């Protein structure tokens, strides 16, 4: 199991936790002094109260929680949000309210999930042309949307 250093920046902060034994993502909770209301079609930056030291070659991805998206139309506009291995600041979550009603975030609310993933650095090799494939340049629904 990968060990990641974490600092609680606020004594009231909840550290990330897996909700089930086989969950891919850890729940991230809001660490705020007063409730924050996110009006429809607006965003809010929500602090978590902790900072990470990810090992080189890893990133943390912040993703929406499916229940918030389904029930309240709350998501992350930049999903997945990336936390780089060399970032040492507080983890904060940008939430957006796609719904029609204001949404209240309170201290301790689980607002996102975090997945730690290995990343590979790449070096590009510029060439005159790319190898061919059956797919070619087809994209953006070129295979259709109905049953096959």
From Swiss-Prot:
Keywords: Hydrolase, Magnesium, Metal-binding, Nucleotide metabolism. Pathway: Pyrimidine metabolism; dUMP biosynthesis; dUMP from dCTP (dUTP route): step 2/2. It is an enzyme of class 3 (hydrolase). InterPro entries: dUTPase (IPR008181), dUTPase-like (IPR029054), dUTPase-like_sf (IPR036157), dUTPase_trimeric (IPR033704). GO terms for biological process: dUMP biosynthetic process; dUTP catabolic process. Its cofactor is Mg(2+). Pfam families: dUTPase (PF00692). GO terms for molecular function: dUTP diphosphatase activity; magnesium ion binding. It catalyses: dUTP + H2O = dUMP + diphosphate + H(+). Substrate binds at residues 65-67, 78, 82-84, 92. It comes from the Bacteria. CDD domains: trimeric_dUTPase. Its EC number is 3.6.1.23. Belongs to the dUTPase family. HAMAP family: dUTPase_bact (MF_00116). This enzyme is involved in nucleotide metabolism: it produces dUMP, the immediate precursor of thymidine nucleotides and it decreases the intracellular concentration of dUTP so that uracil cannot be incorporated into DNA. This is Deoxyuridine 5'-triphosphate nucleotidohydrolase. It comes from Pelodictyon phaeoclathratiforme (strain DSM 5477 / BU-1).
